[in-house]
Structures are given as C-alpha cells and as structure tokens.
C-alpha cells in the first residue's frame, strides 16, 4: 500500500507531518510518499528525526512539489493555477494510480475542489462531502458534512445520507445505520428552508434509497447513542464540530484545574484518575484522525488543519 501525504498542508507543516509519519511508519505495512518542497523536507527530516531517519528512510519517499496551497488561497483558483503544489501533485498521483490514498491537512475548499476536479466524483453524486467520526455513548457518531460544502441544496443532504449509510454499513457492519438530520428541534416544521426541504425529501425517498431515516435530531441528543449518522450542510456541521472540540478542551482544562487545586483534591482524585483519563481521551479530537471525503473515486482524507504529529 502506498500512502500519499501532502507534507506542506496544515498549520504545523511540514514538521508535524514528518514527525507523525516517522512515528506511524513503524506500526503500518505501507510505503509513505511525502509530497512537498524537497529541499525543505530533507533538511527538516534530518533536524527533526536525527538518527531515527536512518531507520525509516527506506519506507519514506519524497516527491518534489515547488508550490504550496495556503489556507488563505481561493480554492478553485489555487487548484487551477498552482499545478506544482503539493496538493495538486498528490491528487494527480492518486488519479494515475501512483498511490492508494491521499492525506492532507491543507485548505479544505481546495481539497474538495481538487478531489472533485482531478480525482473525479462517483457517478450520481453532485458534491463529495466530509464524513468525520465523533465519540458517542455507544461507539461512534459520523457527522457529514463536517466542513466541505458551506452552501448546499436539499438534494445534497439526501446524497450525504445515502453515502454515509453505505459507508457505515460496509465499514462498521451496521446493517441499517440510523440517519438523523441535525436541527434545532425534532418537529418536521422546525429549521430553515434547507433543513425542512431536506427532511421531506429524506422522508419521501428513504425507502427507495435504503436509508434508515429517523427524523430530526437536536445537537444535545446526538451523542446519546440513538443515531449513527448526523447529516448537515458543511457550514452547520463544521460549527457543530468546532463547538464540540472547544467544549472538550474546556472540560479537560476544568478537570485538571479542579484536581490539582490542592493536595486534598489530588489525593481524593487518585482512585478516579484512570476513568478521568479515559474520559479526557474520548473528548480529544486528536484521537479521531481525519475525515474521509465520500463521493470521490479514490480515498481522500482531510486531516485537521491544526494537526500535530500525534494526529498524523
């Protein structure tokens, strides 16, 4: 297996990418191809990895790409004009069969555009979308779309539900995953026009599309185990996702401050530390890797823009 990695994408690139790949390569049976500015990658690899570089270098290959698509770049323009960027080179390699999967922590809009224009959409899908995995009371919750498409039509949300249902059925083994529509209430009449129209389409065609649609789901109910997939447009989904990440940080920080407030609280917390550690770990978005683009012909993974070595 060949894993293509955009070494220049993300807030902490290329250092976090280099560290992450070097740590992971020992535990996976794959060749990793780093795509980016060759001189920079060679220099940083030597400085960061030191002697460890000799151990992993045989399974890590560097492909030169002179340009970088930044977070500030206009997505479509960047994909069309920066032909020698790490992202575009990666997409072309994936399309041509020079790799099995492409991973990037770079510009989400550019990643969506490149995946759509270069790798290509699956027939019948208007817009690929990001399927992110979140912790839930029983197992995990898939959120789709979690940031790729900020402006959607009702048919897009129906297709998101269809793709997510097939994805969960084939990867997790849930035969009829429960699909919910993220909304401000459970009633059919609640929500904006996009959500209300999407609800009616999902209700009407769920049987034909083999979607187990259970209706509207409020954010506060999403993690209780009653839904397997939460459907939203990319704007709403991303706000929801970032809110969860922020709340997780708040909980971890508050617990830490409470426990270490004084010696008595530290001693009192000792029996609960394993459970608290597991809880804190479940709230850490770094434990859940990247989001998979569903709807394109080959696997494309979007890592968090602020990914560190652990997440990679």
List where the protein language model places each region.
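Phosphate/nucleotide-donor binding subsite
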Residues: 51-99
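Glycine-rich phosphate/nucleotide-binding loop
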Residues: 116-129, 133-143, 226-230, 234-312
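Glycine-rich phosphate/diphosphate-binding loop of Rossmann-like nucleotide-binding domains
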Residues: 15-16, 28-33, 39, 151-219, ...
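N-terminal phosphate-binding or glycine-rich loops at protein starts, especially the Walker A/P-loop
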Residues: 1-43
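Flexible, glycine/charged-enriched surface loops at secondary-structure junctions
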Residues: 56, 171-179, 208-220, 261-270, ...
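Short, glycine-rich nucleotide/cofactor-binding loops
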Residues: 3-15, 148-158, 302-310
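Short, conserved active-site loop motifs that form the nucleotide-linked donor/cofactor pocket
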Residues: 59-60, 141, 211
């Amino acid at each position: 297996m060949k894993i293509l990695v955009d070494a220049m994408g993300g807030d902490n690139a290329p250092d976090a990418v280099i560290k992450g790949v070097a740590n992971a390569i020992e535990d996976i049976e794959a060749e990793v191809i780093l795509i980016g500015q060759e001189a920079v990658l060679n220099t940083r690899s030597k400085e960061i990895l030191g002697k460890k570089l000799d151990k992993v270098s045989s399974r890590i290959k560097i492909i030169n790409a002179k340009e970088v698509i930044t977070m500030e770049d206009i997505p479509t323009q960047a994909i069309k004009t920066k032909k020698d960027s790490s992202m575009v080179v990666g997409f072309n390699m994936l399309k041509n069969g020079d790799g099995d999967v492409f991973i990037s922590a770079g510009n989400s809009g550019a990643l969506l555009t490149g995946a759509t224009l270069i790798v290509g959409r699956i027939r019948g899908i208007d817009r690929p979308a990001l399927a992110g995995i979140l912790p839930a009371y029983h197992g995990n919750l898939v959120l789709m779309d979690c940031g790729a498409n900020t402006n959607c039509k009702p048919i897009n949300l129906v297709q998101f539900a269809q793709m997510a249902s097939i994805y969960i059925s084939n990867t997790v083994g849930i035969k009829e995953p429960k699909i919910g529509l993220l909304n401000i209430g459970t009633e059919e009449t609640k929500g904006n026009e996009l959500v209300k129209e999407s609800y009616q389409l999902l209700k009407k065609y769920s049987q034909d599309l083999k979607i187990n649609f259970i209706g509207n789901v409020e954010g506060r109910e999403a993690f209780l185990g009653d839904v397997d997939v939460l459907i939203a447009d990319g704007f709403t989904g991303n706000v929801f996702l970032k809110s969860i990440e922020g709340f997780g940080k708040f909980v971890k920080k508050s617990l830490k401050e409470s426990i270490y407030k004084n010696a008595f609280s530290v001693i009192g917390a000792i029996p609960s530390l394993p459970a608290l550690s597991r809880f804190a770990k479940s709230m850490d978005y770094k434990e859940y890797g990247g989001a998979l683009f569903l709807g394109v012909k080959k696997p494309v993974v979007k890592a968090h823009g602020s990914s560190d070595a652990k997440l990679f």
